[in-house]
């Protein structure tokens, strides 16, 4: 095993800081699809629902028994309010290896979520798409329709959970977290269609926005835990090396 590079951070850390072409391509594709969907909605007279929107909306209205509607409301509630921020902070804390790293990672995860929320809010106000008719709603909703706030928020939190699991969990636990996070985010988004407060294209826009934003951020930062850029060695072997170098 090669010794740490005395001239700077270890080679692994320098490689982690490089942008991933794959992540950049995913971010570009998601951004392009989001832009195409937004332009399509804006060019429709009155920002009316797209053909697929109306068909799925009508299906939801005719398949809403009380039990499923109540369950959908409960699941949707987990994607708004304080819950997403608590989950994001928890995900960030799990990515650290000690108290300091857990604190910094939790704050970084919250910052990523808040920045994403600000971007979503700005786009929602700029697009200003009306929601489905109020008579079709089976829950409370506010604001404009696109992109869906619940869908974007839950997808952002799911992405942060997947990032945390990739850095701080064993393989089996990692796959469990990834699966649960994706299923939860998808479920929250679908409830917004089922409850009649969003068009399907609103939910798709939220997913695309979250995916594009997170993959672009991961490409820029190398997807590393934020504390990796701090001037402290990542492990005891590197700390011993620096202590020896300083004594010399």
Task: Please tell me what each predicted stretch does.
Residues 67-68, 100-105, 133, 171-176:
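Membrane-helix interface segments
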Residues 108-112, 116, 120, 206, ...:
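Alpha-helical transmembrane segments in multi-pass membrane proteins
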Residues 136-248:
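Membrane-embedded catalytic cores of phosphoryl/pyrophosphoryl-handling enzymes
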